[in-house]
């Protein structure tokens, strides 16, 4: 992988991590088109995800800081309750990561990966369409039950091609939660799992294996900058209820991808 390829992939990751169009699916398609070696996948993916975590913290810093301050209060408060809901939502993806991480990574190397990605993009399109046309009641706050269900949706999105943000946001909306609250919760709930994965890879000594540090840094920077822009954009899109356009895009991308595989 050269520096230009790293920058292009960083841009793809930064944009698609927050848009409900599957960052893993688009990243896999981009790698296939750019001819990036598959053995570089895990190392580079971890770096790009770490960049988007940082962009999330930057964009939502006021909320992150409010939660951190409230977390250390002696009295149980709304901030501590919110953090507990975030922790609850992270349990399913933690279990999936612990039990099936190797199988999921092996799936990325499979010759039929584009078929899987295509199918998951079509599923993402379906979920977003359901969320757009459903008219549930608007709950003031996300409940513990809803937090866990949204967490289950995030665990399902471990499948390549199934959009994490699309799945969690659609699930939250179908459960009757307010758009702005769901968007914020969706972006905050992924921070700890991705940070945890990044730290585990760093501890194993594999974080820079197989790819030059400068190339890795270029991809990280590109992903961070575009991630900041995409995060702000997506929050506004969810507030305005414009998810149907992403449903149409995912359907088109899934169909084109699967046709390109068989034709």
Regions found by a protein language model. Name each.
Residues 1-263:
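Multi-pass membrane proteins that catalyze or facilitate reactions on polyprenyl-/lipid-phosphate substrates
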């Amino acid at each position: 992988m050269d520096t230009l390829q790293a920058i292009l992939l960083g841009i793809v990751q930064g944009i698609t991590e927050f848009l409900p169009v599957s960052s893993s699916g688009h990243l896999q398609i981009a790698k296939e088109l750019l001819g990036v070696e598959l053995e570089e996948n895990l190392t580079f993916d971890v770096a790009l995800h770490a960049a988007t975590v940082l962009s999330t913290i930057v964009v939502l810093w006021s909320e992150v800081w409010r939660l951190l301050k409230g977390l250390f209060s002696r009295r149980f408060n709304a901030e501590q309750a919110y953090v507990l809901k975030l922790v609850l939502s992270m349990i399913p993806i933690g279990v999936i990561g612990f039990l099936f991480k190797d199988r999921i990574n092996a799936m990325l190397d499979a010759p039929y990966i584009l078929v899987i990605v295509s199918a998951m993009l079509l599923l993402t399109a379906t979920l977003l369409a359901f969320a757009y046309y459903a008219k549930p009641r608007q709950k003031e706050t996300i409940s513990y039950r809803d937090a866990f269900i949204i967490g289950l949706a995030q665990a399902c999105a471990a499948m390549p091609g199934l959009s994490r943000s699309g799945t969690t946001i659609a699930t939250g909306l179908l459960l009757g939660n307010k758009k702005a609250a769901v968007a914020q919760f969706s972006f905050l709930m992924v921070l700890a799992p991705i940070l945890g994965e990044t730290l585990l890879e760093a501890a194993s000594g594999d974080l820079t294996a197989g790819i030059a540090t400068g190339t890795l840094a270029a991809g990280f920077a590109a992903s961070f900058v575009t991630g900041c822009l995409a995060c702000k954009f997506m929050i506004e899109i969810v507030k305005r209820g414009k998810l149907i356009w992403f449903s149409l895009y995912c359907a088109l991308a899934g169909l084109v991808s699967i046709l390109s595989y068989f034709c």
